[in-house]
């Protein structure tokens, strides 16, 4: 990760509402309206925070459709852990991502099919 990317990520994570969005979406996938209610911020504020989180790979956005055919996005936090290491020489930000059970199952099925 470049210094510019690290600085951008640290800036994003310095916001309390952004951290709340990450925590809420670690529990379960949530729409912007659900996040608005859970984090006590406007839907516009949710979008202002989910866009950079998605760009940095910290949130996964997925399109969902309701029974009436209307579409909306749900967000799921991707990182398992974000570690900031500060030394006298450098600052490093590391993101470790948990392999999801569904991803492991799909990989297993594909492996079985190829044999």
Give the residues covered by each predicted segment.
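Short, cationic-aromatic polyanion-contact patches
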Residues: 3-17, 31, 63-86
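Short, locally clustered residues in the helix-turn-helix/winged-helix DNA-binding domain
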Residues: 14, 23-27
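A short acidic, leucine-rich amphipathic alpha-helix
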Residues: 21, 34-40, 53
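Residues within the DNA-recognition helix of helix-turn-helix
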Residues: 49-50
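Glycine-centered, phosphate/nucleic-acid-interacting loop/turn motifs that mediate DNA/RNA or nucleotide
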Residues: 57-58, 63
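Amphipathic alpha-helical dimerization/coiled-coil segments
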Residues: 80-115
């Amino acid at each position: 990760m470049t210094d510019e990317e690290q600085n951008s990520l640290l800036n994003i994570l310095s916001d309390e509402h952004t951290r709340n969005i990450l925590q809420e979406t670690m529990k379960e996938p949530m729409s912007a309206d659900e996040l608005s209610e859970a984090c006590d911020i406007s839907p516009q504020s949710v979008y202002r925070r989910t866009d950079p989180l998605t760009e940095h790979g910290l949130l996964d956005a997925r399109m969902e459709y309701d029974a009436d055919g209307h579409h909306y996005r749900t967000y799921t936090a991707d990182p398992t852990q974000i570690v900031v290491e500060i030394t006298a020489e450098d600052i490093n930000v590391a993101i470790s991502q948990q392999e999801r059970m569904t991803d492991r199952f799909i990989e297993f099925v594909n492996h079985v099919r190829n044999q």
